[in-house]
Swiss-Prot record:
Membrane topology: Single-pass type II membrane protein
Organism: Arabidopsis thaliana
Positions of transmembrane segments: 12-34
A biological-process GO annotation: xylan biosynthetic process
Protein name per UniProt: Protein trichome birefringence-like 31
UniProt cross-references to InterPro entries, sorted A to Z: TBL, TBL_C, TBL_N
Misc. comment: Contains 2 motifs that are conserved in esterases, but it is unlikely that this protein belongs to the catalytically active pectin esterases.
Family per record: Belongs to the PC-esterase family. TBL subfamily.
Pfam families: PC-Esterase (PF13839), PMR5N (PF14416)
UniProt entry keywords in alphabetical sequence: Membrane, Signal-anchor, Transmembrane, Transmembrane helix
Length: 413
């Protein structure tokens, strides 16, 4: 009887211990969950957003190191493209909305860039937003770069609830925010990268240009600490073979050969890069020149037109027009090679050279206004073969940027 009582007592004691441990474990788990919930609540109250659930980036999403995404061809794809439409994206400016402005065809929207040795990962807005979680992505440059910024905003904005996104204009910047990710996509107007008299975002002189080749501080204050920086500067340099500029004493204005001035400006940028960029925390990209298609005789010998009314890409492999300055290309390559591996060169020039069909031509703006009926009838004088329609070619530049961002991304769960 005594032995049985002792056994029962031990069993009860064991059960009690198991129950007690279970309660302690459950209590600890509950406390941790409550703390996490409380922390999220505090973050939500402080920043006005709730963190969006993470999306997993797989190995299949990431480019192989050996893949050259800049060599390939344009293939027709009217199933997967465009990635968005003019109607679906309220952030496009009139300069790029060619369909809305009267362009009769939409073929330019349905070409997909296919690298020769690999495939670009299919663009996924949720995955990009997860890569940009708690980060800032900033595009810096001229109006071509502004189109790249607008393209990227249009590519991601449709997956974000209306009340969880915002768009702010704070000259010389534009800022798109995805609140659930605490992420922003931004644009900074700096057509020469270094300082100039054309730095006002809207009221800038086009013909009288004066560049301060050794001055970058005014701009760079807005770049410091940004997680992903994408630089571009070309078209504004190419208005004339020579350009007025200063170096040192701002009262001494000299006339420089454009390529000489460009090199001096880029070296000023490189000095800033080496002293201010934290390569462990920041990613920096530099985009090559966006080509122009001003003279049709370059791809169609004997003709005397422009890019107006062009419907298809150039199919001549390695085509290179006179609008893309080879010396500037070499300067960029030399300066970036001295900066080292901490900057990624987005060499979009060759793939964009083929796209004579993608420009706004007479379906854009001139000096802030849409072309008149009379001006549209004169594409040789009024057609814009510099800027691009959206959706269009800049979307591909962003798909390539997306591929590079995915390649370096590490999941944290």
């Amino acid at each position: 009887m005594s032995i049985q009582t002792t056994a029962d007592s031990r069993m009860i004691q064991s059960i009690f211990q198991v129950v007690l441990v279970s309660l302690l474990v459950l209590g600890s788990v509950r406390w941790i969950l409550d703390e996490l919930k409380s922390k999220e609540s505090r973050i939500s109250k402080l920043y006005g957003f709730r963190q969006k659930e993470a999306v997993f980036v797989t190995k299949e999403d990431q480019l192989d190191e050996s893949c050259n995404v800049f060599e390939g061809q344009w293939v027709w794809d009217n199933v997967s493209y465009p990635l968005y439409t003019e109607k679906s994206c309220p952030y496009l400016v009139k300069q790029t909305t060619c369909q809305r402005n009267g362009r009769p065809d939409s073929y330019y929207q349905n070409w997909r860039w296919k690298p020769s040795s690999c495939d670009l990962p299919r663009f996924n807005a949720l995955k990009l937003l997860d890569v940009l979680r708690n980060k800032r992505l900033m595009f810096i440059g001229d109006s071509v770069q502004r189109s790249t910024f607008e393209s990227m905003v249009c590519m991601v904005q449709s997956v974000i609830p209306e009340k969880k996104k915002s768009f702010h204009r704070i000259p010389p910047m534009k800022i798109f925010k995805a609140e659930e990710y605490n992420a922003s996509i931004e644009y900074y107007w700096a057509p020469f990268i270094v300082e100039s008299i054309s730095d006002h975002a809207t009221n800038h002189t086009v013909h009288k240009r004066l560049v301060k080749l050794d001055a970058i501080e005014k701009h760079s204050k807005s770049w410091e600490g940004v997680d992903v920086l994408v630089f571009e500067s070309y078209v504004w340099w190419m208005h004339q073979p020579k350009i007025n500029a200063t170096y040192g004493d701002t009262s001494e204005v000299r006339e420089y050969n454009v390529t000489t001035a460009y090199k001096m400006a880029l070296e000023t940028w490189a000095k800033w890069f080496k002293t201010k960029i934290n390569s462990e925390k920041q990613k920096v990209f530099f985009t090559s020149m966006s080509p122009t298609h001003l003279w049709s005789w370059e791809w169609n010998p004997g003709s005397d037109g422009t890019c107006y009314d062009e419907l298809y890409p150039i199919d001549k492999r390695s085509y290179w027009g006179t609008g893309s300055n080879q010396e500037i290309m070499k300067i960029v390559g030399d300066v970036l090679s001295r900066v080292g591996e901490n900057v990624t060169f987005l060499n979009i020039t060759q793939l964009s050279e083929y796209r004579k069909d993608g420009h706004t031509t007479v379906y854009g703006e001139r000096r802030g206004k849409l072309l008149t009926k009379e001006q549209r009838a004169d594409p040789k004088n009024y057609g814009d073969c510099i800027h691009w329609c959206l959706p269009g070619v800049p979307d591909t530049w962003n798909e390539i940027l997306y591929a590079y961002l995915l390649r370096s991304h590490r999941n944290f769960f």
